[in-house]
């Protein structure tokens, strides 16, 4: 199952960008034997400002995908539950899992409503670059849990 983090905007070179690359590479390598991956980040530029225009740009990357929207009103899941969900989707034959990260104002409510699920990183608001890094790390953590790796400790 391919895993994509589809996000509005391009990140400048930064420590967060390096973290995203590190965890995407780790998740891709660890997931290969489990039928997970590759893991990729797709940066989407919207030609017009606003949530509706951003949603239209994001929709171009969602065909045939199980979509989870990163949204502050979503469910915050423990890492094991997150891993179990990814494993369950893989076992159900989902070929592509997409996590959506919106722009500075979040995702368009209509796009969130169309998603198969919503994910939150708790009640706080996080900077865009950190949200990407945290999601990439959690995807890697989920893959390592499914692989039985000692990376995650309860």
From Swiss-Prot:
Protein name: Ribosomal RNA large subunit methyltransferase H
Family in the record: Belongs to the RNA methyltransferase RlmH family.
Primary location class: cytoplasm
One Gene Ontology term of the molecular function aspect: rRNA (pseudouridine-N3-)-methyltransferase activity
Pfam families per the UniProt record, alphabetical: SPOUT_MTase
Reaction(s) catalysed by this chain's protein: pseudouridine(1915) in 23S rRNA + S-adenosyl-L-methionine = N(3)-methylpseudouridine(1915) in 23S rRNA + S-adenosyl-L-homocysteine + H(+)
Keyword Isomerase attributed: no
Lineage: Bacteria, Pseudomonadati, Pseudomonadota, Alphaproteobacteria, Caulobacterales
Function: Specifically methylates the pseudouridine at position 1915 (m3Psi1915) in 23S rRNA.
Record's GO cellular component terms: cytoplasm
Summary of subunit composition and partner proteins: Homodimer.
Entry's EC annotation: 2.1.1.177
Transferase listed as a keyword: yes
InterPro entries registered for this protein in UniProt: Alpha/beta_knot_MTases, RlmH-like, tRNA_m1G_MTases_N
Binding-site residues, S-adenosyl-L-methionine: 102
NCBIfam families in the record: PRK00103.2-2, PRK00103.2-3
Subcellular location: Cytoplasm
Superkingdom to which the source organism belongs: Bacteria
Alphabetic keyword roster: Cytoplasm, Methyltransferase, rRNA processing, S-adenosyl-L-methionine, Transferase
């Amino acid at each position: 199952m391919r895993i994509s983090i589809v996000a509005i905007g391009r990140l400048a070179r930064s420590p967060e960008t390096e973290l995203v690359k590190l965890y995407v590479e780790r998740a891709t390598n660890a997931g290969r034997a489990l039928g997970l991956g590759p893991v990729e980040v797709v940066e989407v530029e919207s030609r017009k400002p606003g949530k509706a225009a951003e949603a239209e740009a994001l929709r171009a990357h969602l065909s045939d995908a199980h979509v989870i929207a990163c949204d502050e009103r979503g469910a915050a899941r423990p890492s094991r539950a997150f891993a179990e969900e990814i494993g369950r989707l893989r076992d159900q034959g989902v070929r592509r899992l997409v996590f959506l990260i919106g722009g500075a104002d979040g995702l368009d409510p209509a796009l969130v409503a169309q998603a198969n699920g919503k994910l939150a990183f708790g009640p706080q608001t996080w900077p865009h670059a950190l949200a990407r890094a945290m999601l990439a790390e959690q995807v890697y953590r989920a893959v390592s849990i499914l692989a039985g790796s000692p990376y995650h400790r309860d």
